[in-house]
Amino acid sequence: MAHALTQAGVAVAVLEYTLLPEATLAEVVREVRSAVAWLYRHAGAYGIDRDRIHVGGSSAGGHLAAMLLGDAWQSRFNVPQDVIKGILGLSGLYDIRPLCDIGVNEWLRLHDEQAALLSPALDLPLQGPPVVLCAGGLETTGFKHQTLYFHALREEHGLPVRLVENTHNNHFNLVNELANPQSALFQATMDMIG
């Protein structure tokens, strides 16, 4: 994936974050926001244009990328409101409140109020960068529903969003489409980056 993107002229930085349940989801979101702020401040040293930061993620990474769309975090990390120029979300969860009611919450440790605060679908900005969304055609119903729901919600609020159709990938191999410059997902990503 990184090779195809760098061949197309995109500088790629990979963020690391503490995995759950070692950290809470709120702590992980803070880590990702902090990493973006660090990248913004140090981009020049790595040949990265800090005014063209786009963030993408798959599964939990799709959720974390979407958590960068809200309006409330940038001032706390001393970055411009529009630090993020685009988001790529692959099979992400955008409203995590349903997770409070299933077994996975034993290690997520979420309560309803936290889940609402950590749901990008419930924190839509008045303006925002373009978002490209995709869920694999062989994905489970829940991830497909979350992707379609977030797409519809952004459209309804007049926020720039593009849904990329995919019929042949599942939750685990969808990201491989970014290694193929001929794929619709790669092309949509490059269109967003500009």
Regions flagged by a language model, labelled:
Residues 1-194:
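Alpha/beta-hydrolase superfamily serine-hydrolase fold, recognizing
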